[in-house]
Swiss-Prot record:
Main location: cytoplasm
Pfam entry (one): SHMT
Keywords: Amino-acid biosynthesis, Cytoplasm, One-carbon metabolism, Pyridoxal phosphate, Transferase
Matches recorded under SUPFAM superfamilies: PLP-dependent transferases (SSF53383)
GO CC annotation: cytosol
InterPro entries: PyrdxlP-dep_Trfase, PyrdxlP-dep_Trfase_major, PyrdxlP-dep_Trfase_small, Ser_HO-MeTrfase, Ser_HO-MeTrfase-like, Ser_HO-MeTrfase_PLP_BS, SHMT-like_dom
Protein name: Serine hydroxymethyltransferase
Length: 413
């Protein structure tokens, strides 16, 4: 970044500081990952200069013959990965992908069945502080009080009672496999559409290590980062019968020109997801998550649902007599990055919370394996149990530094 360094020292310094943070800390935020240098190169390419309103072959600007090729590559690769009939790779985010689906099939005030945010759902699944909860009549389903797993009988009962036009499956903090086939059966029974938000698990689905929602859902939305390990962005997969409507909902419905440099980066990431080593990577994510969950439980920590089936673990910190906010802060102080998170049947404020959400996608990309998961479990427990002991926290910092120094990040940057 020689040009940036010469031209804008302040921005360069901030970027260098962030690179230093990523190199020196253990990244456990479940929604984050480390992209390849090829993905970064595509996103930083001259495609950032090109306006391309519309779709390949039907643009409102000239000079789109090369970006058309890039977008077609991205769409074709997604179809190959997930078996989708139609794909739109233009959404700038997962939230905008969800918005486009809602705009396609719903009218203001329509009833939708979605997962309670504190039970693992997402803001765009009907939270009252989000457009989805303002524009539509969302009815919430959640998890069982004992098992902390989705209660499908309750979902069916609420679907029969409220007759939603759309049912939303998928989550941002649910560590278990979701039965998409069961959701489709429920949707069919009440005459509803089914949308699956697979943002967190898309990479695991791509590798064939998690059930694929595409055969069961009318619409599937996802981000392109997280376990899929691409640039920050979104996309929509749908049945061919909804293709024109979905495309119109994205453009000109809620977006203008697509970010062609980001779509190029998406295409590169999708190409990576088609390689054999991506399946190995995804399997390592799951193996690491299971090992980390086991280690945390051996240390006496409480896990929501008792473990994990995917990349995500939700820790209930109440038995440590601290809050999620305190846990996030003290872990960050020693070099472990997590996020505070609500837990099912939460009683604390969402700014305080009773839980911490962690994930293994980023550390797996970095090369961490089972032995490192044992050390991370020990570090998390040691830090939280000694959160007011500065000598113990200093010891934890040294252990984090010793661990991260073994796995250099982005050596060419």
């Amino acid at each position: 970044m020689d040009h940036l360094k010469r031209q804008d020292e302040k921005v360069f310094a901030a970027i260098e500081a962030e690179l230093g943070r990523q190199r020196s800390k253990i990244e456990l935020i479940a929604s984050e990952n480390f992209v390849s240098e090829a993905v970064m190169e595509a996103q930083g390419s001259v495609l950032t200069n090109k306006y391309a309103e519309g779709y390949p072959g039907k643009r409102y600007y000239g000079g789109c013959e090369h970006v058309d090729v890039v977008e077609d590559i991205a769409r074709d690769r997604v179809k190959e990965i997930f078996g989708a009939e139609h794909v739109n790779v233009q959404p700038h985010s997962g939230a905008q992908a969800n918005m486009a689906v809602y705009f396609t099939i719903l009218e203001q005030g329509d009833t939708v069945l979605g997962m309670n945010l504190s039970h693992g759902g997402h803001l765009t699944h009907g939270s009252p502080v989000n457009f989805s909860g303002v524009q539509y009549n969302f009815v919430e389903y959640g998890v069982d009080a004992e098992s902390h797993r989705i209660n499908y009988d309750d979902v069916l009962a609420k679907a029969k009672e409220h007759k939603p036009k759309l049912i939303v499956a998928g989550a941002s903090a649910y560590p278990r496999v979701i039965d998409f086939k069961r959701f489709r059966e429920i949707a069919d029974e009440v005459g509803a559409y089914l949308m699956v938000d697979m943002a967190h698990i898309a990479g695991l689905v791509a590798a064939g290590l998690h059930p694929n929602p595409v055969p069961h859902a009318h619409f599937v939305t996802t981000t392109t980062h997280k376990t899929l390990r691409g640039p920050r962005g979104g996309m929509i997969l749908c049945e061919e019968q909804f293709a024109k409507q979905i495309d119109k909902s994205i453009f000109p419905g809620i977006q203008g020109g697509p970010l062609m440099h980001v779509i190029a980066a998406k295409a590169v990431a999708f190409g990576e997801a088609l390689q054999d080593d991506f399946k190995t990577y995804a399997q390592n994510i799951i193996n690491n998550a299971n090992r980390l969950a086991e280690g945390l439980q051996k240390e006496g920590l409480t896990l929501v649902s008792g473990g994990t089936d995917n990349h995500l673990i939700l820790i209930d910190v109440r038995n440590l007599e601290i809050t999620g906010k305190v846990a996030e802060h003290v872990l960050d102080e020693v070099g472990i990055t997590v996020n505070k998170n609500t837990i099912p049947f939460e009683t604390a404020s969402p700014f305080v919370t009773s839980g911490v959400r962690i994930g293994t996608a980023a550390v797996t990309s970095r090369g961490f394996g089972l032995e490192e998961m044992d050390e991370i479990a020990s570090l998390i427990a040691y830090t939280l149990k000694n959160h007011e002991n500065e000598a113990a926290l200093e010891e934890a910092r040294k252990r984090v530094e010793a661990l991260t120094s073994k796995f250099p990040m982005y050596p060419n940057l």
